[in-house]
C-alpha cells in the first residue's frame, strides 16, 4: 500500500476582520511613504462593530488624513452598507499615534557597525528589532508556492471577484477558504481531498443556492479538474448560516493572519507580522528577502524545495545567521548554497531595501491574499533575476 499524506492550508478574504485591519495598517503606511520615503512606521489597527482604532509609533515629516485613509480602505473592501454593522461612512475612527522611541531609533538610524567605524552606506541602518525570518519556495506550482495555500488564496480571491462584479449578488465581504491536498509517497500533490468555504451572504440566500454557486463558479473555476474526483469533499457554509460577519461578527487585529500571509503552515515562521511596518522592520523586509532567495534557488534548479532562515540583532546591520535547508533536494551541499547566497544577496537592512526598492508605497496590495507567490501583482521579491548569479556563485564556491 502506497503512503499517502494530507496537508491543509487556509486563506481569508479581504473582508475578514483581521484582513481589514491589515489593509488599513498598510494603507496608512503607503500614504506616509508616498510623501516621506524615509519614514519609520509601525501602525496597528483594531476593528470591531462600528469602530476602528489605529495606534502605534511613527516618525515622519508627512501629514496624512488617517480618517480618510481608513474610510476609503473600508469602502474599497466593500463595507458600504449600514446593515453590515460596519460601513465606511458611519464607522468611528480613533487614531492614537506617537513618535517612535528614541532608544529604538538610535540603533536603526546608526547601526552598530557604523558606530564602530564602518563607512559603507549600507551599514548605516541597523535592524529595527531582533528576530528570525523564514522564506520558502517549492516546485509544486508555477509561482513556486505550496499548492494548498495557492489554491486557498485563489478561492477567496474568486469569491471577491464574483461579489464585486455582481455576478453573485448576495455575497458579502467576509469569507474563508481551506484546502486539503493529498500527496503521494514522493511528496507530489495528486488530488484535492477537501475544500471548505464559508462565505458571508445576504439573509435571503438559500444554502442550496450558495452551495451550487460556490461549487460551480468558485471551486471548479479555480481548482484544476485533474485534482477533483468523486471522493473530494465540499463543505460550503457548514454552520448553515453566515449573515452576520466582518467586524460585526468578530473583532479584527493587525498581524493575526501571519500563516495566511506566508506559506499556509507548509514552512516555518519566525512569528513576526508584516502589515503596518516600514522596511527597516526586518520582520517584513527580511521575510521578503528570504522568499526572494528561496524562490531563486529553486528556479535555478539548485533544489526543488528551499527554506531560508535569516536572523538579526536589534541595531546591527549584518544578519547574525543565514541558513538554507533544502530537505535533501539540493544538487550541491547546503553549505555551498549558503556561501553563494551571502555572495549574491546583501542582507543588511539597507541592502535589502535597496535590492527590493522597499521605500515605495507598494504594501496595501499585499495585505490580502498573501504576500508571497502573487501572480496578480508585480512584487520585487517574486522576481527571478538572481538565478544566473546564484548558479555562477555556486561554481565559484565549489
From Swiss-Prot:
GO annotation, biological process: one-carbon metabolic process; S-adenosylmethionine biosynthetic process
Pathway in which this enzyme or protein is active: Amino-acid biosynthesis; S-adenosyl-L-methionine biosynthesis; S-adenosyl-L-methionine from L-methionine: step 1/1
Cofactor binding, note field: Binds 2 divalent ions per subunit.
Predominant cellular place of this UniProt entry's protein: cytoplasm
Binding locations of K(+): 44
Residues annotated to bind ATP: 16, 174-176, 241-242, 250, 256-257, 273, 277
One of the record's GO molecular function terms: ATP binding
Location of the region described as Flexible loop in the Swiss-Prot/TrEMBL record: 100-110
Residues annotated for Mg(2+) binding in this entry: 18
Pfam family, one: S-AdoMet_synt_M
GO CC term (a single one): cytoplasm
Required cofactor(s): Mg(2+); K(+)
Key words, A-Z: ATP-binding, Cytoplasm, Magnesium, Metal-binding, Nucleotide-binding, One-carbon metabolism, Potassium, Transferase
Assigned EC number: 2.5.1.6
Keyword Metal-binding in record: yes
Residues holding L-methionine: 57, 100, 250, 281
Enzyme type, top EC level: transferase
PANTHER family: S-ADENOSYLMETHIONINE SYNTHETASE (PTHR11964)
Function: Catalyzes the formation of S-adenosylmethionine (AdoMet) from methionine and ATP. The overall synthetic reaction is composed of two sequential steps, AdoMet formation and the subsequent tripolyphosphate hydrolysis which occurs prior to release of AdoMet from the enzyme.
Family: Belongs to the AdoMet synthase family.
Quaternary structure annotation from Swiss-Prot or TrEMBL: Homotetramer; dimer of dimers.
The protein's name: S-adenosylmethionine synthase
UniProt organism field: Streptococcus pyogenes serotype M3 (strain ATCC BAA-595 / MGAS315)
Amino acid at each position: 500500500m502506497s503512503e499517502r499524506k494530507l496537508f491543509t492550508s487556509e486563506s481569508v478574504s479581504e473582508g475578514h476582520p483581521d484582513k481589514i485591519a491589515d489593509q488599513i495598517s498598510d494603507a496608512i503606511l503607503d500614504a506616509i511613504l508616498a510623501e516621506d520615503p524615509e519614514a519609520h512606521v509601525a501602525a496597528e489597527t483594531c476593528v470591531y462593530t462600528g469602530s476602528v482604532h489605529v495606534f502605534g509609533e511613527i516618525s515622519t515629516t508627512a501629514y496624512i488624513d488617517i480618517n480618510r485613509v481608513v474610510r476609503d480602505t473600508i469602502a474599497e473592501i466593500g463595507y458600504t452598507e449600514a446593515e453590515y454593522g460596519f460601513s465606511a461612512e458611519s464607522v468611528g475612527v480613533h487614531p492614537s499615534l506617537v513618535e517612535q522611541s528614541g532608544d529604538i531609533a538610535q540603533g536603526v538610524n546608526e547601526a552598530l557597525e557604523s558606530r564602530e567605524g564602518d563607512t559603507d552606506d549600507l551599514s548605516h541602518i541597523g535592524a529595527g528589532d531582533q528576530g528570525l525570518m523564514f522564506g520558502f519556495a517549492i516546485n509544486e506550482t508555477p509561482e513556486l508556492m505550496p499548492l494548498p495555500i495557492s489554491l486557498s488564496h485563489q478561492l477567496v480571491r474568486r469569491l471577491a471577484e464574483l461579489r464585486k462584479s455582481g455576478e453573485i449578488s448576495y455575497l458579502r465581504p467576509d469569507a474563508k477558504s481551506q484546502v486539503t491536498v493529498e500527496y503521494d509517497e514522493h511528496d507530489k500533490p495528486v488530488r484535492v481531498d477537501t475544500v471548505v468555504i464559508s462565505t458571508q451572504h445576504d439573509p435571503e440566500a438559500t444554502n442550496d443556492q450558495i452551495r451550487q454557486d460556490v461549487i460551480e463558479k468558485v471551486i471548479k473555476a479555480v481548482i484544476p479538474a485533474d485534482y477533483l474526483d468523486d471522493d473530494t469533499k465540499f463543505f460550503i457554509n457548514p454552520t448553515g448560516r453566515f449573515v452576520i460577519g466582518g467586524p460585526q461578527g468578530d473583532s479584527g487585529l493587525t498581524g493575526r493572519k501571519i500563516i495566511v500571509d506566508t506559506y499556509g503552515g507548509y514552512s516555518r515562521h519566525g512569528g513576526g507580522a508584516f502589515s503596518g511596518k516600514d522596511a527597516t522592520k526586518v520582520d517584513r523586509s527580511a521575510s521578503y528577502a528570504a522568499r526572494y532567495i528561496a524562490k531563486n534557488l529553486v528556479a535555478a534548479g539548485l533544489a526543488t524545495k528551499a527554506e531560508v532562515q535569516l536572523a538579526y540583532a536589534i541595531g546591527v546591520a549584518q544578519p547574525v545567521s543565514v541558513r538554507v535547508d533544502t530537505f535533501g533536494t539540493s544538487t550541491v551541499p547546503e553549505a555551498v548554497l549558503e556561501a553563494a547566497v551571502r555572495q549574491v544577496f546583501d542582507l543588511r537592512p539597507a541592502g535589502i531595501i535597496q535590492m527590493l526598492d522597499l521605500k515605495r508605497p507598494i504594501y496595501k496590495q499585499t495585505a490580502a491574499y498573501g504576500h508571497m507567490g502573487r501572480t496578480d501583482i508585480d512584487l520585487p521579491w517574486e522576481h527571478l533575476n538572481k538565478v544566473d548569479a546564484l548558479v555562477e556563485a555556486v561554481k565559484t564556491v565549489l
